[in-house]
């Protein structure tokens, strides 16, 4: 088995074991024990061992989940770190209790970052237990080793990371007991009961565990080796990640496209006709556009073509995690991580189904109960008042497009829940998920589209309009947006206006003509919405809906990747109008400049992610994947050379504020003041100098710029220690060749009161 090659992980983990029979009837055993006479206790010792109470141990990922499971199982007795009752022990992991050990664990010399130590490629992987979670690990280890525990149920999150969390603890505890897997998509009591009635053999998920383990090891190898390599070569800490760096490359590339973009002006002639307007083609020659406008002004336009089509717009599919994060960012302004956190809370509160899903459909066994759920959700949502609700279950049922988990939907518990008591963020996400369910099963949006072509002065002009036949799902969407204080308009609203009845050959008077000037626009800065979309397709602009997706990261990991890019200083969130843009820092651009293709290529990294999926499906051996990662790193360390001219690339450019009064060199702002950049010159204006501190003022760039240019600067809000009041005055620079001194001039500019 593959598991036998995992160093400290026992190969017995991967041995498939037969399921156990259900536990004996507890009351019957208690009654049988009660008829034994006291004198027979010693004689019955052997029999007692055989009839000892047996338990099944359930290990969840979080205490809150364990509590919900225990309530359904009847494990009501609280113990230290677990719950007990009805033949069950229920405990929890507190997330990642253990993880891959750091480099220094393998060799103390690795504590210091040195080029000669690279690449660091462990032969036998080691794991360490988080210090702040040691107590809970000890509880789990004791439970896993108890003789009365006959079977272990893995109830950690039903996904790649949940599998890794459980298996790591199981193996570190030295456990070899049979594993059963709880795999559910909802925390509703009914879903929990059904899940425990259909526990699966743990061996069914060996591939999932191997994929999770390979992902963790690959991230460790790339992070440790590439980060150390580039940090040592470029003399500053540069965090590099297997998925993080290609994601950053997408953003840097977009910024380069924006910077290189040169807008091209264009001109469009617009004619006002009775009841509507038409537009001509874009023209690059302004004079020609003016000439056409003059020719059309006061003239007649002839209708050349009228084309009417009945069209239908299908409802949007249900949410997977990524599409929900995108909409929540665009409509609500939430980051991907905020949306995931809110959705996780709703899942644990039994109000939404499993969050980390990549499917947008439901399974056929859910079809029968769907109309009831839709009605419950509709009644709980205030924005749908007055709108008829229907349920086309067939539109959202697609068994082949559901793998581990179905789409995110509300649960029936929404009926009893007090939604007003939910935190604002959770309520907003629940409403968005509810809206999508109601829209997805609603009728299509039907409309008649009219396209008209008119001729005037030998040029063609066009217009489009539409008449709504059935608002369908768009009525719900419009009602939801109307309930929000501010929300983007629906797509297509610009063409919702109907055109008047027109006939080919009809002549229309031109009431007015105008030339509208525009410019071609650059690509847009990434937002979390558009970046998540790019990560799904590894930067490809288009991808067929049915294509095998090879994206950057997974729905479960993308939010964390974005947050790390921000926390490490590579990305900045900058608000622009109603959107928050993601902009790369100076260091981000510098890093992508020096990174080789194999570390920044989105397509190559997406291929790695695809191979992890192959490991999960049993189509690729884990060691083949890992050997590819190791070979890449060996080549990288052995062949990479510092790019000439980039030695100082990671020193942020200093903004020059003026010329030095002593040597004529450049004076630039730094953290503690303004300094001459000529190393032989000592001119400095310190931000925290005693003179400025007494005035309770700090020299700004504007003040220093004026002092260097004119020798004086008008400063407001200076503090008087004598009167305790503030005043305005002119500060004069008085440099004696050793120190930059200052004095006040109250006579140069009137009006500043002392």
Residue ranges and their predicted role:
Residues 2-12, 17-19, 25-29, 33, ...:
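N-terminal amphipathic/hydrophobic targeting modules at extreme N-termini
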Residues 286-319, 325:
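Metal- or metallocofactor-binding catalytic centers and their adjacent structured scaffolds
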Residues 48, 53-57, 79, 133, ...:
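Basic, low-complexity terminal or inter-domain segments flanking catalytic cores
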């Amino acid at each position: 088995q593959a598991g036998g090659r995992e160093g400290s992980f026992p190969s017995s983990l991967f041995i498939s074991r037969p399921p156990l029979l259900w536990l004996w009837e507890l009351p019957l055993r208690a009654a049988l024990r009660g008829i034994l006479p006291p004198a027979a206790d010693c004689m019955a010792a052997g029999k007692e061992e055989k009839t000892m109470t047996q338990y099944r141990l359930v290990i969840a990922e979080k205490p809150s989940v364990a509590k919900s499971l225990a309530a359904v199982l009847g494990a009501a007795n609280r113990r230290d770190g677990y719950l007990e009752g009805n033949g069950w022990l229920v405990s929890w992991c507190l997330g990642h209790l253990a993880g891959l050990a750091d480099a220094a664990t393998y060799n103390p010399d690795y504590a210091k970052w040195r080029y000669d130590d690279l690449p660091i490629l462990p032969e036998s992987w080691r794991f360490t237990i988080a210090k702040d979670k040691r107590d809970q690990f000890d509880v789990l280890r004791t439970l896993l080793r108890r003789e009365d525990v006959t079977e272990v149920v893995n109830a950690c999150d039903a996904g790649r990371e949940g599998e890794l969390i459980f298996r790591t603890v199981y193996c570190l505890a030295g456990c070899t007991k049979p594993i059963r897997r709880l795999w559910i998509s909802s925390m509703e009591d009914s879903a929990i009961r059904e899940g425990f009635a259909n526990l699966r053999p743990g061996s069914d998920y060996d591939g999932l565990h191997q994929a999770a383990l390979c992902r963790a090891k690959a991230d460790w190898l790339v992070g440790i080796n590439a980060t150390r390599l580039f940090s040592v070569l470029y003399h500053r800490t540069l965090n590099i990640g297997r998925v993080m760096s290609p994601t950053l490359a997408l953003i840097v590339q977009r910024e380069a496209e924006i910077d290189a973009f040169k807008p091209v002006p264009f001109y469009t002639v617009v004619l006002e006709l009775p009841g509507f307007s038409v537009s001509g083609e874009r023209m690059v020659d302004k004079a020609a556009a003016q000439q056409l406008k003059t020719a059309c002004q006061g003239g007649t336009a002839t209708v050349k073509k009228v084309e009417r089509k009945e069209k239908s717009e299908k409802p949007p599919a249900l949410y997977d995690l990524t599409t929900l994060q995108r909409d929540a960012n665009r409509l609500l302004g939430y980051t991907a991580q905020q949306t995931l956190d809110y959705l996780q809370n709703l899942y644990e509160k039994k109000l939404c189904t499993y969050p980390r899903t990549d499917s947008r459909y439901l399974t056929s066994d859910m079809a029968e109960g769907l109309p009831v759920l839709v009605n419950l959700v509709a009644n709980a949502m205030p924005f749908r008042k007055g709108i008829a609700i229907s349920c086309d279950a067939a539109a959202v049922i697609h068994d082949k497009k559901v793998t581990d988990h179905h789409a995110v939907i509300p649960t029936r518990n929404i009926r009893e829940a007090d939604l007003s008591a939910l935190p604002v963020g959770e309520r907003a996400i629940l409403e968005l998920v509810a809206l999508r369910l109601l829209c997805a099963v609603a009728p299509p949006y039907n409309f008649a589209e009219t396209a008209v072509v008119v001729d005037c002065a030998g040029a063609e002009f066009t217009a489009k309009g539409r008449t709504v036949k059935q608002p369908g799902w768009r009525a719900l969407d419009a009602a939801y947006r109307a309930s929000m204080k501010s929300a983007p308009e629906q797509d297509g609203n610009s063409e919702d206006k109907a055109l008047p009845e027109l006939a080919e050959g009809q002549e229309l008077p031109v009431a007015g003509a105008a030339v509208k000037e525009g410019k071609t626009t650059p690509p847009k800065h990434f937002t979390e919405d558009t970046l998540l979309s790019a990560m799904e397709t590894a930067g490809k602009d288009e991808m067929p809906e049915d294509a095998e997706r090879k994206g950057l990261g997974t729905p479960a990991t993308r939010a964390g990747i974005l947050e790390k890019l921000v926390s490490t200083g590579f990305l900045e969130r900058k608000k622009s109008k109603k959107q928050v843009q993601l902009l790369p820092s100076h260091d981000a651009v510098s890093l992508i400049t020096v990174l080789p293709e194999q570390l920044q290529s989105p397509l190559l990294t997406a291929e790695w992610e695809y191979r992890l999926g192959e490991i999960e499906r049993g189509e690729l051996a884990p060691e083949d994947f890992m050997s590819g990662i190791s070979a890449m790193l060996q080549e990288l360390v052995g062949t990479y050379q510092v790019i000439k001219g980039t030695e100082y690339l990671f020193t942020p450019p200093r903004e020059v504020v003026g010329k030095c009064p002593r040597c004529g060199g450049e004076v630039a702002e730094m953290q503690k003041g303004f300094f001459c950049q000529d190393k032989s010159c000592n001119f400095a204006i310190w931000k925290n100098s005693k003179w400025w501190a007494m005035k309770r003022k700090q020299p700004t760039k504007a003040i220093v710029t004026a002092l260097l240019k004119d020798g004086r600067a008008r400063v407001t809000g200076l503090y008087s220690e004598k009167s305790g009041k503030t005043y305005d005055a002119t500060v004069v620079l008085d440099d004696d060749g050793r120190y930059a001194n200052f004095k006040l001039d109250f006579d140069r500019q009137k009006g500043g009161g002392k």
